[in-house]
Amino acid sequence: MFPVEAFQATLGKATEIFQRLGVRFHLTGGGTSVLYGEPRMTQDIDIVVDNQVLAEQLESFFRLLDTDDFLFDPPSVRRAVERREMFQLLDKVEALKLDIYPRELIAGELDRSCLIEVFAGVQLPVVSRVDAAAAKLVWISKGSHKSRRDLRQIYRTSSEADRQRIQGLAHQLVLKPLLDEVLGEPEELA
């Protein structure tokens, strides 16, 4: 497990790059499970970015990554952005990996990002609770076991209004039976 300071340093560098380029982004994945559910170990940082703006700014993105101590493979990143597939960056100083998703898994999720204090005095855009739950449901449908527990914890700590929105989104995604199945599972013993 990496110290909090490593996450903060790496995120600070990455968010500065996205902000300088005008690329909308938000945190997602295991880190948001910690924010919305309960603490669990995570080894990387997951970030969803606006594909269109990133594609337009790709050469500038590469230059900024070079100056901020990130290890990356330009042809792989270019291909991933074209295909809207995940690519990775490695912070050479902190040895922390960033998984960058140049597409929204849930349509419109970047428009619903929430500013949350992720570190003391540092607010960052984070996937909304409802979209986080819906994304976990999509990952479960693709075989992610870890997302099952995350989804239950996010749902359990949601307001009734958010639970209704999660149910509605699951219905839209044609994953309502899977949501019911996951919510009906017993909690694992720690």
Where are these predicted regions, by residue range?
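Compositionally biased terminal segments of proteins
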Residues: 1-190
